[in-house]
Amino acid sequence: LVGSEMCIRDSFKGRQWPPGSMEEGDSRFLESVLAEVLAHLEPPKDGRIRHDVPPASLRKTTDLDLPLVGAGLDRVLSDIRTYLSQAVRTDQPGFMNPLWGGLTPEGLAGELVTAATNTSMYTYEIAPLASLIETAVLDRMRQHLRMPTGAGTLTTGGSNGNLMGVLCARQAAIPASGHDGFDGRSWCMFVSNEAHYSVAMAANVLGLGLANLIKVDTDGHGRMDPSALDHAIRREANMGRRPLCVVATSGTTVRGAFDSIDGIADVCETHGVWLHVDAAWGGSCLFSTTHRHLMDGVERADSVCWDAHKMMGLPLVCSAFIVKRAEVLRAACAHVNEAHYLFHDDAEERDLGRLSLQCGRRNDALKLFLSLIHI
């Protein structure tokens, strides 16, 4: 540790260590950066969203060699200009390739403040107001989901939210699995054949195995067929495999289909199976009086993931995972009990790190909080 600190100190020769208060010229530099960013956010004069430059050509026109001696802030500002000139204009209305895009001023402001305050969300001690803001945001999202009780956390995205949904399903079905492990070969999980690939990732990571991921037929509109789901669960049960969970999708990646949550929930209740809803894209329909019906029945789900950075146009990443039974999420994250140096009994109810798979975690709630204040 001492040797590492000496190396770091040496790299900061001529500057304050640890880096902290602004030095002379730093404020002017940041003002210049902000001016460049604001200029970049003006509509492109040629209307283009991206410049189709092959990697080899871009390498030739961009200095990517990292210097062995610091080149100073003027070089940094020059490189920022270069970066902005080649950036895909994800803030523009014409950017429609993925399921996210756009930019709101309050969202950008939240990102700037989050970066400037640079805290982590594991304990109230180090992120007091940020912890309360995240709790307030999650409470509002639960209200829209019509889940009066429960808990949640901000995650790294919908893929992480789906992973946590399956993890909580495993915890509910096999309470000792987090401590003892489990044999995934006797269990299976059900998804539509148009579900996001992150559900397969969850099956892989959690030890269920891709062979035990059962894909259920969809109708002509790309929605999971509840009767086909019921048949699949019964078929697998006859083969000696137990259902771990069902993942419904609210807004599929390719066709934007919304599964019938009510129909799927009926099947899950019949078989006593955990229902997770992947509402990464479609969750924001809950803010719409016109389109809310697409998610009818979501209050019957056991867990939900919801990406505010998609339909709401917030900067990446702003994604929530919400579970109806808080005790299941706490038990699924029991690994935090090993961190006695970080988490203490007297702060158990206010330390958000106890409900997360992450330790270091940025304050992604602020931009959503500011957005909800604005709209």
Regions found by a protein language model. Name each.
Residues E134, L138, G150-D180, V199-A203:
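Conserved beta-loop-alpha segment that forms the PLP phosphate-binding cup at the N-terminus of a helix
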Residues A257-T289:
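Catalytic PLP-binding core of fold-type I/II PLP enzymes
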